[in-house]
Amino acid sequence: MKQPELTVIQRAVLERAAALGLPAGARILDAPCGSGVLAAALAERGFAAVGADVDTEAAAMLGPAFSQVNLNESLPWKEQTFDAVFSTEGIEHLENHFSFLRGICRILKPGGILLLTTPNIAALRSRMRFFGSGFFGRDSRPLNEAARHPLHHIGLATFPELRYKLHMSGFRLTEVRHTHIKPISYLYAFYAPWMWVYTKLAFRKEKDPIQRKRNKEILSTLLSPSVLFGECLLLVAKKV
């Protein structure tokens, strides 16, 4: 049976992992791990990688390094178990982002790293789809209420929302990147100046001086190529 290949998103994660400075043998949790191909690739590179998912597909590839876990529930690992947690295209499927992120924070060692990817609904192409239909780019119609599925996008979030949730859950965001950009997305650059003006005006309403300073960081990221054109966000956060 042919083994699944890394997706473009997983390749971006693997490339970024190599630059995080994690030592050989570092304990990494990949959750959700899907087929297990990313956890297997991390193990091949010398990391002590394990995978977890509600689906058991990865058991065939990872063997004892796989655990069946419902990420909507309390995470089963002890405090300070992992050096890093990778969560690729997972948080948008979960019921409670805060609970998940605080659970991740609990099982990370001090200074541990969370690498997270999720669909970028703040991209210009996604914003224009929402303007026209009321639905973001990843979901062009209502979710099927008669057939609930673990892969339903029940928790899509913008970059500012994700930043807030990370900072309220024991993390400090250190990097914001994109996994990949589709050429068609650049056609929407026409709308970027209007977005710049509208966003600047909206941010002027903040009166709190501390938040105004933080909003400068948020604004800079919102207007970056990664957020304006990226298909998926790749966020790196550190446990504080």
Where do the PLM segments sit?
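Conserved N-terminal segment of class I S-adenosyl-L-methionine
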Residues: 1-79, 84-88, 98-101, 155-159, ...
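A short hydrophobic/small-residue beta-strand
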Residues: 49, 114-115
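Short catalytic micro-motifs in class I SAM-dependent methyltransferases
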Residues: 89-93
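Conserved class I S-adenosyl-L-methionine
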Residues: 115-140
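A short glycine-rich, Lys/Arg-flanked "PGG" loop and its adjoining helix->strand segment in the class I
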Residues: 98-113
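Short N-terminal helix/helix-N-cap motif within the alpha/beta-hydrolase-1
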Residues: 36, 95-99, 119, 126
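A SAM-dependent methyltransferase catalytic signature shared across enzymes that methylate proteins
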Residues: 159-177
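Acceptor-substrate binding/catalytic loop of class I
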Residues: 145-161
